């Protein structure tokens, strides 16, 4: 955890700074989970109310029925986004592409590390 004020906490994974709601003790260690259904993908950088926007590499694409799980990597951060097959086709996403990963500060679920 880098900073926590006004019910907004910033934390770092590798060199990537992310934001979540809630109060945490600065310099504390936490675990982070973001549900794949909460992650939005965009080809271009967009102006949005979402606090978290990461430029990531598409590592793998797994088709599951009418959905697609897009496996993403940026620095030490690994994420999976679940999108519809139609959206994947419209965005023309392929392994090796770089894409913007977007999620709101309310999306990450943080787990406090016990001492």
Regions found by a protein language model. Give the residues of each.
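Glycine/charge-rich catalytic "coupling/switch" loops of P-loop NTPases
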Residues: 15-61, 82-115
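Short, acidic/hydrophobic/Gly-rich beta-strand patch recurrent on exposed beta strands
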Residues: 9-14, 33, 69-75, 82
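Short, conserved beta-turn/loop elements at beta-strand boundaries and strand-helix junctions
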Residues: 3-8, 61-67
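A structural signal for short hydrophobic beta-strand segments in well-ordered beta-sheet cores
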Residues: 1-2, 58-61, 72
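Conserved active-site beta-strand-loop modules that form the wall/rim of enzyme catalytic pockets
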Residues: 7-9, 28-29
């Amino acid at each position: 955890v880098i900073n926590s004020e006004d019910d907004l906490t910033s934390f770092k994974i590798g060199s990537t700074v992310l934001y979540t709601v809630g109060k945490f003790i600065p310099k504390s260690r936490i675990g982070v989970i973001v549900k794949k259904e909460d992650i939005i993908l965009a080809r271009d950088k967009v102006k949005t109310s979402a606090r978290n926007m990461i430029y990531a590499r598409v590592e793998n694409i797994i088709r599951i029925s009418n959905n697609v799980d897009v496996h993403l990597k940026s620095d030490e951060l690994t994420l999976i986004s679940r999108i519809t097959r139609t959206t994947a086709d419209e965005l023309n996403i392929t392994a090796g592409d770089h894409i913007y990963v977007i999620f709101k500060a309310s999306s990450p679920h943080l787990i406090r590390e016990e001492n």
